[in-house]
Amino acid sequence: MISVDFSKGLVPTIILDDQNGDVLMLAYMNEESYQKTLETGYTWFFSRSRNELWNKGATSGHTQKVKQIWTDCDNDTLLIRVTQIGPACHTGKKSCFFNLIKEDF
């Protein structure tokens, strides 16, 4: 198995919808949340604001069932394809990326 580089503590983690490849959210994992994700098959992250682990959807029911886990060329960023149940964003939107800044460059 490929080793993820947690030497800086947190690893950016991009979450994609496995059905269509849409970007759902960006969160951070530490080694403990990564291990819990591997063990349970559901996403676990590290909350920088609350300084604690959180299981995505534990409160809302909007869970993320892991389908695939990828790492980048430096092994310090993760991309996880999931089956998303309900919206991924705490605002109720499907994706956390819904604020267009500019287009048509």
Swiss-Prot record:
One matching Pfam family: PRA-CH
GO biological process annotation, one example: L-histidine biosynthetic process
Keyword Cytoplasm assigned to the entry: answer is yes
Q: Do you know which InterPro entries this protein is assigned to?
A: PRA-CH, PRib_AMP_CycHydrolase_dom, PRib_AMP_CycHydrolase_sf
Cofactor: how and how many bound: Binds 1 Mg(2+) ion per subunit.
Annotated Zn(2+) binding sites? C73, C89, C96
Q: Name one GO cellular component term.
A: cytoplasm
How does this protein assemble?
A: Homodimer.
The name of this protein is: Phosphoribosyl-AMP cyclohydrolase
Q: Which gene encodes it?
A: hisI
